[in-house]
Amino acid sequence: MQAYQRDFIRFAIDRGVLRFGEFTLKSGRTSPYFFNAGLFNSGSALAQLGRFYAAAIVESGISFDVLFGPAYKGIPLAAATAVALAEHHGQDLPWCFNRKEAKAHGEGGSLVGAPLTGDVLIIDDVITAGTAIREVMQIIASQDGAKAAGVLIALNRQERGNGELSAIQEVERDFGIPVVSIVSLNQVLQFLEDDPQLKQHLPAVRAYREQFGV
């Protein structure tokens, strides 16, 4: 585990974004942990979050021309990542996002920001069912000269859907692009193992990983 990944897990726990206990997911599964990126909800938290996304991009080695933030949650994530890449890595890259509803006046269309062209890196919080990412792939496919280079999310739950694969593995298979994350559940497990105060949650998270993991 890289230092930035350990720092990210600590940061997510401190912000209440990553919690341990008993949570019922939309899938109906009872999970021993819950990740809610909506709680990165202050200026300082968003700035820090952008730095973690930027570090993961640099680490991944994915080459791309433009960042894309899917509406709604991906918009501040793409903005914060673009700022962090410029300020901390000397990479001043264009970014854009989509509107859920196309505007009939003003700029018009459903895309805002830089032109969506070249290799596109999609920034989002998590991939649960993969539905949102599939919609994004249609948006990218509709733009001349644009193609997806990859997807970056905060946490890979490494969890099976209804079949044998996770939603992330299905996206990778169907679109032939990498999906990378700041951290994965395996790294969260490693963090719990090393933390005396949180180690009590390790058996439940490990059992969940064994039952539903990929």
From Swiss-Prot:
CDD domains from the UniProt entry: PRTases_typeI
Pathway note: Pyrimidine metabolism; UMP biosynthesis via de novo pathway; UMP from orotate: step 1/2
InterPro entries, A to Z: OPRT, Or_phspho_trans_dom, PRibTrfase_dom, PRTase-like
Residues in the signal sequence: none
SUPFAM superfamilies per record: PRTase-like
Binding of orotate, residues: F34, F35, T128, R157
Name the record gives this protein: Orotate phosphoribosyltransferase
Gene encoding the protein: pyrE
